[in-house]
Amino acid sequence: GITPGWQQMQDSFKIAIESIHNGLGREESLKNVKKHSSFVGSMRTNLVEMLDGLKLNEKLKIQSSLSLFNEHNHLLHTTSALRYPVFKDGKNYTGSSPSPIKNSFLWEEINDSLVNEMSLFKSKLIIPLGKTVSEILSQIKSDGKLNENILLDGFPHPSGANGHRKKQFQMNSSNMAKKIKDWKINN
C-alpha cells in the first residue's frame, strides 16, 4: 500500500506492547506486529480472494494465499511505499494529493526506504496495491531500480472502500495471471 493508516499504526503499537509484556524479544515482537497487522479484516479476505483467483497459491504450491499470513508467512514480505504513517489534514494520506512522485519530500522518502528495500530482492513478485503504488513502482522501474523483480501492475487496492476493485481486477486479471504463471521463482 501507500502508507500505514491510523488504525494499522494503533494496532501495531498495541500488538508490540502485548508481545513485549508476554516476554517476546524485540525481533519476535516486530515479526508478531507484521504478521498480525498486515491486511486485517475484509481487506485480507479481498486480497486472498484476488490472489487465489490469479492462482498465486498454486504457483507457490500452497492451499490458499491465506496461509501467507500464517504458516507460510516466510514467503511474504509486506511493506508500504511510505514506510511510516502519513496524514493530510488530519486524515490518512491516500496518495492522490499531493502526488508522491511530484512531491520532493515524499519522493525522497520513497527512494530512501522503498527503493533500498527493493534492492534486497531479485526475481521476486511485487504486488502494488492500488493505482498510486503502481505508478510509484512503475517510476522506480523506469529509473532502473526494480532489480529484475516482476511488477504485477494493475492489481487493485483490496480495501472495501475501493468500489472499482472487482471491475479493475477483471480488466487486468488475464495479464496478471500470465505474469504469475511465467514468473521464475528464485528462492
For each feature predicted by the language model, list its residue ranges.
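A polyanion-binding, active-site-adjacent surface
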Residues: 2-127, 132-140, 150-153, 160-164, ...
